[in-house]
Amino acid sequence: MYKRQILIISISVISINSGFGYFLALIANVFSHYVFDQALRITKGYEKNKSQIYVDEAEKKLSTFNGPIIAITGSYSKTTTKNTISQVISTKSNVFATPESFNNRLGISKSINEDLNSSHEIAIFEMGTYGFGEIREMCSWVKPHISVITGIAPVHLERMKSLENILDAKSEIVDLTGTVIINGDDELLLNQARLWTAQKMVIDCSITSKNAAVFVDYENSIHSIYISGKFITSVEGSKILQLSIALTVGVLIALEMDIICLLYTSPSPRDRVR
């Protein structure tokens, strides 16, 4: 978005300074979106070719990794959820998690090649996308066992055109996985998830409904955790972590880990939303 704004402003200034006035500035603003998207398509091909050697190396390295692989996507709270999952599981296991902003094929492959080692027991990958096929391609060599979708929102709507398209692009993370953890308060996502239940384990995590597989209630800095309607335990933390905690519990269920023990021994996650 930042690059696009620069492009729009630059073209508009040129139009006005050249004496063509408001009309050409308006036309420039409209067509700059098209020019920007075309530029992205061109650079995307270049980036893909340039990064293939790193992807091949990362895929080979991952092929020898025997632990569970978790992939996370969504329109919001990806980094917060990744950090929360990593922090909770790290109390009992050695966790590899991609660094902040390393969520495309080059960033993910680079972090694998440089930082993943034989001592790691669980790997967590955050995945972003600007269009169709990107997450599917990353999953083809990351091969996640558990996929997490934090929610769908009108981010990059000018490029993706509709929420349904955003949902389809994010849902590519489900194709090769066996278990899916979703934000059960997102109606669009929840409806889509009903199509997955025949072939995959789907765990819906909610901050509003006790009918969900996982429900996290918040009051006075306390998150009360319910599984299948039954109170399990509670943890301290700010309200902005409520969804991330719910999704983390969903992941712990999928991993068949001791939820009470892990949450009890884990320090409060960082209060950060991404």
Placement of each model-derived feature along the sequence:
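Phosphate-binding loop of NTP-binding sites
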Residues: 8-199
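Conserved small/polar residues in nucleotide/adenosyl-binding loops
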Residues: 1-5, 264-273
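Acidic, Mg2+-coordinating active-site environments of NTP-dependent enzymes
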Residues: 149-266, 270
